[in-house]
């Protein structure tokens, strides 16, 4: 029998999505105006020079112009700019098809029009366009990645329509297959979560969760690493900057936290973080070692080490020993030869596993640069391995999805260094109660780990672990 309460509930279920869409439309109309188009044009023009990352250019723009925009307005502009960078060659192909009809329009202006349309819809931007721009937009039919795949699956233009350089596209397909590659590309266009690591030396995870929940955040605790919190896409974690300021939490991708776990840090060990950067993994290692032993954080950049020291000071850790080296032959490395229980090499790489956050990288990185990265990675891994004691462990990781930076480096290293053998990464993690979803299929037949963002909802990472036998 249909009660009054059930009737009200059913009506609510029907009306609620419509109501939400109306509110979203009102929100877009309220905050969008001509200055957004101009701002997007300014930012995208700089980005297309490919001298700096998308994120850093947006940050610099708002640093100067920030007083003119509220947080909601900045988010709208950021979303549009990222859409343009992610879809660059697809948008350019649409513009090219209409070239004869838009001879008086700049490509930059057209890119921004398409970017706004892709994120906010035609109805939002239409009132701010000239007649020729309206005619251009009226002839454009935006397609989803899946529909592009169906239409161009047998075309040489597929990678262009999907906005991926051909050499990257070919590499991904050779590693996985076309269908999985399409899924991966689609995931790089979607909104993504933010992961944080709780510093359990300062605060219990449950206490931090209460504090964050009281601040109105939507988040969940990772089922893999108990110190890891996953915030929903769009959450502004800067609203809890008080927790960051005192070192209670750090932004760190789940994949990055898994790398630290693959090292298996233990109390009183000596662990070398060979490419420490600003110290994200050094901090995680030091925490897991309960502030005992030594984490020797090595980097070639004094600027990065300065930032690392600041983070160490905030974290409360006393077991981090930062060292700046001039090059791989620096004499300061000699004293550590054959002493480390574990050595982590999170090698400098193309960063193509971070395309969700850094979409410009696919346009900035070249094939020749990949070759240079690969050669340098092998040199770094080889030198770092000399710091590992007999019976000690070596972990190699990148945030790249390119074969030449990952498996190829590992194969060359093992062929040149017969005193190192592979480890079973699956069992290493399972012994720490970290059981990765079997459907992710992250372990290859050699024991390497591949995290692909379409499956794991993390940045994409490659990891491998070895033991020094003699």
Where are these regions (language model features)?
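S-adenosylmethionine
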Residues: 4-470
């Amino acid at each position: 029998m249909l009660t009054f309460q059930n009737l009200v509930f059913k009506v609510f279920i029907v009306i609620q999505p419509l109501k939400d869409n109306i509110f979203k439309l009102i929100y877009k109309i309220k905050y969008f105006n001509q200055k957004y188009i101009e701002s997007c044009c300014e930012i995208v023009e700089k980005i297309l020079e490919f001298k700096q990352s998308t994120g850093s250019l947006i940050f610099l723009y708002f640093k100067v112009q920030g007083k003119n925009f509220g947080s909601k307005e900045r988010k709208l502009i950021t979303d549009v700019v990222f859409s343009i960078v992610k879809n660059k060659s697809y948008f350019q192909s649409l513009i090219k098809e209409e070239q004869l009809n838009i001879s008086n329009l700049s490509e930059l202006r057209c890119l921004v029009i398409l970017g706004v349309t892709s994120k906010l819809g035609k109805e939002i931007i239409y009132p701010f366009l000239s007649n020729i721009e309206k005619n251009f937009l009226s002839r454009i039919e935006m397609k989803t990645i899946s529909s592009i795949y169906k239409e161009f699956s047998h075309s040489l233009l597929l990678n262009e329509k999907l906005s991926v350089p051909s050499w990257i596209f070919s590499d991904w397909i050779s590693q996985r297959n076309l269908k999985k590659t399409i899924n991966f590309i689609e995931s790089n266009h979607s909104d993504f979560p933010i992961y944080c690591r709780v510093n359990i030396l300062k605060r219990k995870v449950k206490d931090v969760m209460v504090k964050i929940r009281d601040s109105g955040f939507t988040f969940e605790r990772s089922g893999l690493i108990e110190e890891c919190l996953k915030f929903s896409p769009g959450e502004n974690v800067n609203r809890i900057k008080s927790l960051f300021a005192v070192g209670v939490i750090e932004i760190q991708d789940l994949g990055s936290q898994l790398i630290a776990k693959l090292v298996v840090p233990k109390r009183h060990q000596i662990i070398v973080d060979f490419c420490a950067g600003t110290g994200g993994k050094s901090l995680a290692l030091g925490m897991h070692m309960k502030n005992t032993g030594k984490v020797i954080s090595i980097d070639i950049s004094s600027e990065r080490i300065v930032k690392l020291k600041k983070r160490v000071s905030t974290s409360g850790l006393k077991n981090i020993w930062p060292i700046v080296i001039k090059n791989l032959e620096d004499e300061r490395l000699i004293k550590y030869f054959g002493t480390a229980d574990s050595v982590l090499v999170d090698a400098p790489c193309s960063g193509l596993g971070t395309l969700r956050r850094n979409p410009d990288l696919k346009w900035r990185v070249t094939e020749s640069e990949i070759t240079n990265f690969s050669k340098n990675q092998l040199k770094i891994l080889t030198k770092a391995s000399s710091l590992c004691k007999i019976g000690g462990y070596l972990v190699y990781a990148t945030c790249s999805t390119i074969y030449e930076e990952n498996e190829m480096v590992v194969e060359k290293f093992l062929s040149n260094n017969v005193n190192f053998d592979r480890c079973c990464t699956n069992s290493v993690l399972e012994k720490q109660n970290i059981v990765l979803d079997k459907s992710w299929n992250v372990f290859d037949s050699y024991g390497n780990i591949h995290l692909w963002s379409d499956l794991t909802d993390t940045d994409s990472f490659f990891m491998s672990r070895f033991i020094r036998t003699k």
